[in-house]
Amino acid sequence: MKTLLVMAGGTGGHIFPGIAVAEALRAKGWRIVWMGNPDGMEARIVPSRGYDTAWVRFGALRGKGLVRKLLLPVNLLVGFWQALGQLRRIKPDVVLGMGGYITFPGGMMAALLGWPLVLHEQNSVAGLANRVLAGVADRVLSGFPSVLKKAGWVGNPVREDIASVAAPAARFAGRSGPLNVLVVGGSLGAAVLNDTVPKALARIPLEFRPQVVHQAGEKQIDALRAAYAAAGVEGDLRPFIQDMAAAYAGADLVICRAGALTVAELAAVGVASLLVPFPHAVDDHQTGNARFLAEHGGAYLLPQNELDAERLAGILASLDRPQLLQMAEHARAQAKPRATEAVARACEELAEGRKA
């Protein structure tokens, strides 16, 4: 039985693509071990998947403050030492880095000890850990084109139920009436969307007003309900959406942030979007993610500092379904539906090469 060590953590944008690849290889009989931070999001998500875990306490490489800078060498040494111990214990056939700070100590130690290392960079701007590790990795892959010098563009792995949604033309057939708009704030919500969308809807005459499904995040659902009530508009307001594939499939337009996984899902489904990048993302990578779809005609890119109720209302009022169908098809044309397979295949090839 071959063993894959997945290194990923910090955000769902790193964790869920890693799970997609892990599941593909587990289905082929591989043993999966996950290296992450016991205090990170991965500690809440990964164990329920049934993977073995290898915890390493390691946090941000960058940050402000004298204490953080002074402690960085110590944190690096501790992280390297813990990762080294885990690698020697696990003895993986291949190490897969899917992003997040946790990939740095594990990736460096894997390269030092000669274990095959595959890197996958999800964002349009490579993170610090992957920029360093790309120089020592055996295979470098990316979710967007031209991210790292020697990276092969394979796309971002998405869940099978999302990748298998019907094509835009089939979904749009027979639709009529108000536009169907899906607003996605993510697990934590996006306060600016929660505040602006109901105000924008109130500016659109009732007969032209879109029907809205608005996902707010658990902590912001009460504030969202109050915002819709104050604006005098209605919507299907939810703290979370269980079936994202169905939600995407039913939408004419999605309003959301521009995380790498979100952009990959929008392309995989083939759905028009209005992307409002999170302005404080590291290296402003969400703007780059959004620009990729926008430049190919699949999305509108609206910086947060340009977002207000009047501007959003004007955009929504100007859209029609044929236009959104065309955007959906442009988005779908940028999809990489075999991304999971491509990353898994890279792991298999390196494992076979090591065996030989």
Swiss-Prot record:
Main subcellular location of this protein, as a coarse class: membrane
InterPro entries to which the protein is assigned, alphabetical: GlcNAc_MurG, Glyco_trans_28_C, GlycoTrans_28_N
Similarity remark: Belongs to the glycosyltransferase 28 family. MurG subfamily.
CDD domains: GT28_MurG
SUPFAM superfamilies for the chain: UDP-Glycosyltransferase/glycogen phosphorylase
Name this protein carries in UniProt: UDP-N-acetylglucosamine--N-acetylmuramyl-(pentapeptide) pyrophosphoryl-undecaprenol N-acetylglucosamine transferase
Origin species: Azoarcus sp. (strain BH72)
One Pfam family of this chain: Glyco_tran_28_C
Keyword Mitochondrion: no
Annotated metabolic or biological route of this protein: Cell wall biogenesis; peptidoglycan biosynthesis
Function: Cell wall formation. Catalyzes the transfer of a GlcNAc subunit on undecaprenyl-pyrophosphoryl-MurNAc-pentapeptide (lipid intermediate I) to form undecaprenyl-pyrophosphoryl-MurNAc-(pentapeptide)GlcNAc (lipid intermediate II).
